[in-house]
């Protein structure tokens, strides 16, 4: 995101009234036309002669500002301000966030690092003569420049990830999609994308549904993507070795009257094959082979019940209802990703 210089059009009602500014109907009509307002509405805004400052329109283009300046209406002025421009558009919209008309961050990283990205304005106290001319500088306070923020995001990976989830959303006819790409060695987040998205440079059709950073806010049951944890737990506890096999015959079993089954009878499976075939039987047997506290500690230690430390507004820590008593079936279904909800960011950090 970069700050682009723009102008604001404002009025000093007192000056307008002192100069009989309303006696120039053609100029006021021209001003109303360029601002897309009626003359009556415009003049209502400046009707109170005691007011000294009223915004007529914010963040106008240089061409519009030049046109208004040439109208030369007493009491109508231009003021410098800035507007954020987002080169990546909808690709990174939820991650980067947006600012409001006063350039204050209200979403995403813009909100999180608003103070750092804004800086501190300087000030100057002056003395003027009776005609309003500056005659003396009494006091000057230096401001602080806004800081820069460099992300670990790789824009090429970001764009590719966004393209993929948009296509997947259409293919599977889903209402939303999200993805995160993490460097497994450094932990750097290389991409964080969401769909549907929005164009942060055009605020005319923004809805909360599109603004949500689902990577960190939306929790879901992860299903089979958690199965490696059951294998890891059994290995860590010492119940199995990398060369161990698990008998999944006959492809189903009953636990407390409830059925756990695979899509077919895989028979004897290695640990690697349990993951390759996404075997419910294999992961269930591994999960039930270790003490319950050890199994649950693995889930906690992998960060599935806490936020990721990104410190972004709205981040969910997932949903997990701890129980005083667990049935074998509940532990089995937990091993293949049910009875727990996690965010995309938590799942990415786990791996």
Specify the residue positions occupied by each region the protein language model found.
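Short, solvent-exposed cationic patches
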Residues: 9, 14-34, 116, 206-224
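Beta-lactam-recognizing serine transpeptidase/beta-lactamase-like catalytic domain environment
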Residues: 128-140, 153, 179, 183-224, ...
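Small/polar-residue-rich segments within soluble enzyme cores
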Residues: 4, 21-22, 26-33, 41-146, ...
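Extracytoplasmic/secreted envelope proteins and their assembly/folding machinery
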Residues: 6, 24-32, 65, 69, ...
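Sec-exported extracytoplasmic/periplasmic mature domains
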Residues: 14, 32-36, 69, 73, ...
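Short beta->alpha transition motifs characteristic of CBS
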Residues: 3-13, 99-102, 191-197
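Conserved, well-ordered alpha-helix/loop/beta-strand core segments that scaffold catalytic motifs
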Residues: 53, 134-177
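Flexible, solvent-exposed loop/hinge segments and secondary-structure transition points
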Residues: 72, 103, 157, 164-186, ...
């Amino acid at each position: 995101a970069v700050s682009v210089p723009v102008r604001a059009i404002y009025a000093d009602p007192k000056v307008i009234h002192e100069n009989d500014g309303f006696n120039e109907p053609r100029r006021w009509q021209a001003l109303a036309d360029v601002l897309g307002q009626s003359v009556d509405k415009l003049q209502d805004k400046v009707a109170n002669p005691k007011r000294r400052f009223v915004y007529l329109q914010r963040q106008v283009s240089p061409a519009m500002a030049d046109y208004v300046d040439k109208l030369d209406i007493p009491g109508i002025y231009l003021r410098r301000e800035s507007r954020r421009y987002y080169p990546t558009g909808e690709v990174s919209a939820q991650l980067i966030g947006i600012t409001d008309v006063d350039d204050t961050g209200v979403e995403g990283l813009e909100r999180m690092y608003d103070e750092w990205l804004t800086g501190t304005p300087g000030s100057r106290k002056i003395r003027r003569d009776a005609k309003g001319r500056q005659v003396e500088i009494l006091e000057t306070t230096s401001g602080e420049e806004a800081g820069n923020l460099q992300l670990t995001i790789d824009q090429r990976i970001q764009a590719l990830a966004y393209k993929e989830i948009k296509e997947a959303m259409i293919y599977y006819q889903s209402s939303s999609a999200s993805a995160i790409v993490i460097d497994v060695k450094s932990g750097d987040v290389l991409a964080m994308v969401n769909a549907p998205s929005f164009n942060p440079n055009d605020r005319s059709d923004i809805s909360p549904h599109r603004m949500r950073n689902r990577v960190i806010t939306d929790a879901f049951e992860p299903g089979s993507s958690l199965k490696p944890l059951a294998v890891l737990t059994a290995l860590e506890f010492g119940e199995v070795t990398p060369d161990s096999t698990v008998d999944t015959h006959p492809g189903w079993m009953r636990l407390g009257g409830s059925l756990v089954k695979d899509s077919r009878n895989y028979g004897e499976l290695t640990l690697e094959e349990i993951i390759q075939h996404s075997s419910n039987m294999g992961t269930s047997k591994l999960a039930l082979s270790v003490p319950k506290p050890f199994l649950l500690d693995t889930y906690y230690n992998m960060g599935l019940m806490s936020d990721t430390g990104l410190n972004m507004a709205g981040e969910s820590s997932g949903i997990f209802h701890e129980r005083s008593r667990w049935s074998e079936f509940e532990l089995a279904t937990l091993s293949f990703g049910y009875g727990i909800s996690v965010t995309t960011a938590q799942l990415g950090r786990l791996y």
